Structures are given as C-alpha cells and as structure tokens.
Amino acid sequence: MSTPANGKGRISQVIGAVVDVEFDGELPSILNALETFNNGSRLVLEVAQHLGENTVRTIAMDSTEGLVRGQPVSDIGTPITVPVGPATLGRIMNVIGEPIDERGPVNADTYMPIHAQAPAFVDQATESEVLVTGIKVIDLLCPYAKGGKIGLFGGAGVGKTVLIMELVNNIAKLFGGYSVFAGVGERTREGNDLYHEMIESNVINLEGESRMSLVYGQMNEPPGARARVALTGLTQAEYFRDVEGKDVLFFVDNIFRFTQAGSEVSALLGRIPSAVGYQPTLATDMGALQERITSTNKGSITSVQAVYVPADDLTDPAPATSFAHLDATTVLNRAISEKGIYPAVDPLDSTSRILDPMVVGEEHYEVARGVQQILQKYKELQDIIAILGMDELSEDDKVTVARARKVERFLSQPFDVAQVFTGSPGVQVKLEDTIKGFKGLISGEFDHLPEPAFYMVGNIEEAKAKAAKLMADAA
C-alpha cells in the first residue's frame, strides 16, 4: 500500500546513484518520487525496489555527492511530475522539469506524471501519408510516414546527430505544429548548438511565441536522469497530442543512451544481466516507452529517434530491440561515409513500411526499386572489379557500374546544419524533383554527364549546371 503524501523517511545508505531510504510507517509505491535537499538544491529520488519491511531502494535524478545517512526524505505521493503545455515552448528543462536555460521559472498551469499508460488499442489511429523531409535518399528509398516512428541507426561518428539536426531544421521549420526534442545522454555542446540554431531559425523566439521545447539529460548526468529524460520529453509531447489535439514532432537523440542508462541502473539495483550485459527488462523498458509514442484519434506524434549502434553491430540487443517498434529505419553505414558521401545512408539496408505503390504511387515505387536494383548489381560486381579490374566486365556491366557510381554520388546532399563545416549552402529537394532525377539516371538519360557533377548537389538541374561548369573549367 502506498503512503499518503509527505510520508517521512531518512537515508540509510548511499551507493553512487542508488539511495536506500528507511520509513517508519507504510512504504511509498514503486515509481513514486521522493525529495530531499542536497547542498541547498532539491534532489528527487525515484522508488525502484522495496527491501524488507521498512526500506525502499531509490534511483537519484542528480548527483548524490554530499548526501549523509540519517538525512530526512519526504514522499511526494506521486511519480515525478513535469510542467506541460504552452509554457514549456522555447524552454530547456531537465528530467524533473526544472528550467536550465537561466530564463526564470517555467510558469506552467499543468503538471503531468512522466509514467503513464500507452493509449488503448481502440484509440490508436494509423495513416499512410508521406512526410517529405527534403533529403533525397530518405524521401526516395525509406520515406517517413506522418505519425510514424523513425529510427536513424549508425555507429560512432557516421552522422546521426547531424542528420537528426537537419531533420529538425527541415521539418520543424516548415511544420506549423509543435516539436519536442529530448537530448538523452548526448554531448552538451550539441544541445547548445541546437538551441542556438533554433533561435536563429525562429523556431524558438525568446520574445514571442516558440514552437519547440527542449528536454536535456546529457552525458554528464547520473544514470537515473538519462533513464527518465526521454519519458519527460514524451510526456510533454503527449500533452500537446491528447489535450490540445495537435500533431507533434518528437525527436530523441539518442535512444540507445536510454537503454544504456537502464543497464547501469539495473546493475546498481543488483539485477542479473542478460545478453551482452544489458538489463533483463530491456524489451519491457523499450516497449513501455515506444508504445506511448503513437498516433491517436485526437492527434499524432511523429517521432524521429537516433539509435547508436555499438561497434557497428546491428544485431546488438539494444538496436535490435528498437527495430521491432519502427515504421521506417534509416541505416547509416561507415563504408559510405568513408567514401565522403553524406548523409551516409545505406540505400540497401534502409527500409520503410510505406514504400508501397498503394501509398507512394507507382512511379516513386518503380524508381526506388530501380535505384536499389542497380546498386545491388554494383555491389555484386565489386568483388570481380577488385580481383580482375573494370576491363574484364561486359559492356552492359560497365554501363551498370558507371550509372551506379553516379546514383551513389547523387544520393549525397549538402546540409544546412553542416554549412559551417563544408562551406556549401544546404539544399532541400522536392520529392517530384528527386524522383525525376533518379528516373533519368537509371534510364541512362544522363550517361553523358561526368561522375563528379552528381556529388553534393540538390536536384538534377544543379547536377547539369555543375557538369557544364566542370566541362568549361576543363576546356
């Protein structure tokens, strides 16, 4: 039985992020929030286990340095509650909803608990409409569904964060609705960059109305905060969906850190690990989060989640568990990034539920499959090329290889958010221009253009202009 709010306890043991609290009366419920004060600031603890008759084991949401045994703790009586609604827009908050942008308190009228049930099956809605991103390789080969769940998979340093930033930039700017960005266990510098990028593009307006709220629990935070910050962001997105009936964009960078923090917490709680050292509740934890990210009859949540792939192994339990929940998967490949092709999306490994002629139309489907076919053929010929050289190929195969190399380069694209590094301005390409360009490429219409003309351009007209410039320079 749970204790009434304000049950009093005292700290009996502190081991890193795990704090044991003794209560004389009834114990607080599992997932209840407890609060104490550490060096003058509020510290929230979340109940994880009941030990014996009068002790609970809790996970701290902030550093436990400075806590002492015997220190008083009070039970709030509910799970962690965070501010939701329009007051959160344009603000940066931490896992417990406190502002960390030095712009005063968040004056929200409504607070909601971060733990909630997923919407009932009958309330869920599915629609199959393409969400155009302006990024050629995504729109053509693994189109995103409005109200769907999208995963960006990649190892260390292949461009997940740059791609998610570009998606925030392209979609959140054009998108009239609200967006929520949850930074889970990633670099503080990137969080800071995103904030300033959003201010520059007026998605966050410091004086007027903003369209995005940010929730950060970065790499330096204890595991309790990293394991819960995605739920804090999701709670804010759910409010806009359920109460205000809005279509919401929900970005998470990085969902792997949520799993990683869960694994750290699990080890601290003394649970026996499962495969590769992950927590035994890996699938349950992931399911509890992912099932809440869905579209209902009231509104939709379209989520884009970056998923770090440890050691580039897609069969690792953490990325493998998240695959099952997604509508579209965009896989980033180190071999492609080594060729200097960015975004380094693997055109043969990336999939989408809506790449279907009934949804995207016959022409789009045929062109996408044609592109994949030509790239697959090139992949099969690479062994022969490596051993015998290009000269041993048949004439048809030589044409296929030449086209495939152009297709590969045409799948690259300069990004707005990378402009400071590359010096070339970013471009967004309309879906019809993307289809037109690739249709011409695979049918041989542009066989006369040189390969470099297709690298880091937007639509096919830009490639033609670049080819003319290259020829003029060579003359």
Swiss-Prot record:
ATP binds at G154, G155, A156, G157, V158, G159, K160, T161. It is a peripheral membrane protein. It catalyses: ATP + H2O + 4 H(+)(in) = ADP + phosphate + 5 H(+)(out). Pfam families: ATP-synt_ab, ATP-synt_ab_N, ATP-synt_VA_C. One of its GO terms (molecular function) is ATP hydrolysis activity. Its EC number is 7.1.2.2. Keywords: ATP synthesis, ATP-binding, Cell inner membrane, Cell membrane, CF(1), Hydrogen ion transport, Ion transport, Membrane, Nucleotide-binding, Translocase, Transport. SMART domains: AAA. GO terms for cellular component: plasma membrane; proton-transporting ATP synthase complex. It is found in: Cell inner membrane. Its main location: membrane. It comes from the Bacteria. It is an enzyme of class 7 (translocase). SUPFAM superfamilies: C-terminal domain of alpha and beta subunits of F1 ATP synthase, N-terminal domain of alpha and beta subunits of F1 ATP synthase, P-loop containing nucleoside triphosphate hydrolases. The keyword Methyltransferase does not apply. Belongs to the ATPase alpha/beta chains family. Produces ATP from ADP in the presence of a proton gradient across the membrane. The catalytic sites are hosted primarily by the beta subunits. PANTHER family: ATP SYNTHASE (PTHR15184), ATP SYNTHASE SUBUNIT BETA, MITOCHONDRIAL (PTHR15184:SF71). F-type ATPases have 2 components, CF(1) - the catalytic core - and CF(0) - the membrane proton channel. CF(1) has five subunits: alpha(3), beta(3), gamma(1), delta(1), epsilon(1). CF(0) has three main subunits: a(1), b(2) and c(9-12). The alpha and beta chains form an alternating ring which encloses part of the gamma chain. CF(1) is attached to CF(0) by a central stalk formed by the gamma and epsilon chains, while a peripheral stalk is formed by the delta and b chains. This is ATP synthase subunit beta. It comes from Hyphomonas neptunium (strain ATCC 15444).
